[in-house]
Amino acid sequence: MSQALSPSFARCYGLARVARVWKISRASVYRSLKEMPPNTSARRPGPVGACSDAELTDHIRRQIDASRLHGEGYRKLWARLRFAGVRASPRRVRRVMRENGLLAPHRLGRTKAKPHDGTIITDKVNEMWGTDMTQTITIREGRANVFVAVEHANSEVIGIHASRSANRFEALEPVRQGVHRCFGAIAPGVARGLKLRHDHGSNYMSGDFQDEVKCLGIEASPSFVREPEGNGVAERFIRTLKENLLWLRTFDTIEELRAALVEFARRYNETWLVARHGYRTPAQVRADQRRLDQDAVDDLQLAA
């Protein structure tokens, strides 16, 4: 309209006059003029890569369909594509997934300052575990309590349990599973040097729970009150457990739930990718650390 000629004066109306009559901001007009024309591609200049966007979309869909876990972001899809021999940059994978509605759904909340500037992630396994509980419903037996124990170094599930009761003895079960699995036996002092992170629930703070943990040689490390970030490793696994099992399936009995939890923990340890460990699975990280520890022992024996 600003380039149209006035029939009276045979001159252009001009952008300022049109904006004033239409009561719109000239800044908005100039900003819209700077936007890319609709026929112009938003792609970065240069070679496309080994496959086109359509082919890459097909590869991404195959990886999503083949995975039995939900909620994985574009970085883990990029890693799975790389393992499958499909090379593409993480930014391109994210763009293609966004354009095709394949990104994991998430909520954008308000950003605020967080005082938790430390870390609860350990460098090696068997230095700190986290334990927590959640609840679900079975059809025949009603409410069921789910207890987990998770390794802080590699996010590995080392113990998982379900029961009708949520008392201190049931809360101990995943910890005892982890001790037997990682240290080979249930005996006094067998897990010396290990810390256990838990919240201030009455079952975890009870005398029986604390005495049993102390007997095994474990140092209790409760998180701060009303600060779930302190037990974030266990909290994050419970979110994954809900998104991939508890919210997707129904169970008739607690025993059926317990069997499903054991199977899910096995599959999780073998297939879940941990980004901070180079997109390796928890089982791979533990196996690599075990091999390094054995090599260190062999070197000491040779040196002696």
Which stretches of residues belong to each language-model region?
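Short, amphipathic alpha-helical "recognition" segments used to contact nucleic acids or chromatin
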Residues: 1-13, 57, 61-68
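Residue-level signal for the short linker/turn that defines the boundary of a DNA-recognition helix
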Residues: 12-14, 72, 88, 252
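RNase H-like polynucleotidyl transferase catalytic core
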Residues: 18, 107-111, 196-200, 214-233, ...
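Basic, flexible linker segments flanking DNA-binding modules
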Residues: 19, 26-128, 227-228, 281-290
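C-terminal domain-tail junction helix/linker
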Residues: 46, 207, 214-218, 240-304
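Two-metal-ion RNase H-like nuclease active-site motif
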Residues: 126-136
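Active-site beta-loop-alpha junctions of metal-dependent nucleic acid enzymes
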Residues: 138, 142, 160-187
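Acidic/histidine-rich, metal-coordinating catalytic segments
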Residues: 175, 187-205, 224-228, 280-282
